[in-house]
Amino acid sequence: LLARRDSKRLLVIGTGRQARYQIESHVAVMGLNLQFQVWGRLSERADSVVNEMSKVCSIERVDDLEASARDADIIVTITGSTAPLVLSDWVKPGTHITAVGADAPGKQELEVALVEKADVLVADHIEQCVDHGEISHFVQTDDTRKSTIVELGQVLNNPKMGRRNDSQITIADQTGIAACDIAISQSVLNSW
């Protein structure tokens, strides 16, 4: 729905339990065609993810976040960061980003310029993402920007509201809605 079907490289930024779940879910949906990379502030925690997940997929630890982000087709952020980790200049056309870590006020993983650069900006729940999430930083200076955001449910019901071509940058800001998680899982499994 949002990532290109020909995506080859997936970068996971973060090393907690959720990193493992994200890797497992991408393997389940997209198969083993992806080369996974994991980056974390602590290399030993990234190594732990690699050791555990190498039983499931092809995965490596990376130390150069910028180089890995520049090369990634899909980026998943799942950290507790309060400052941007992924900068706008690092993201190439066609990249999809799922931002999961900014699930509370004050958290931020993406540079605001990157969110501004997105061709498609999707929220699991707009009002919640405006309160806390990557979108909260995006609308902070201009509330009219809310009109450019679509809810994930709208994309699930009408895929044309998601990615329309392979050069678009798409961002999904996921702050956590349980009912949405269930609907997404079912829809993705049905469509892939």
Residue ranges and their predicted role:
Residues 56-143:
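Rossmann-like adenosine-cofactor binding region
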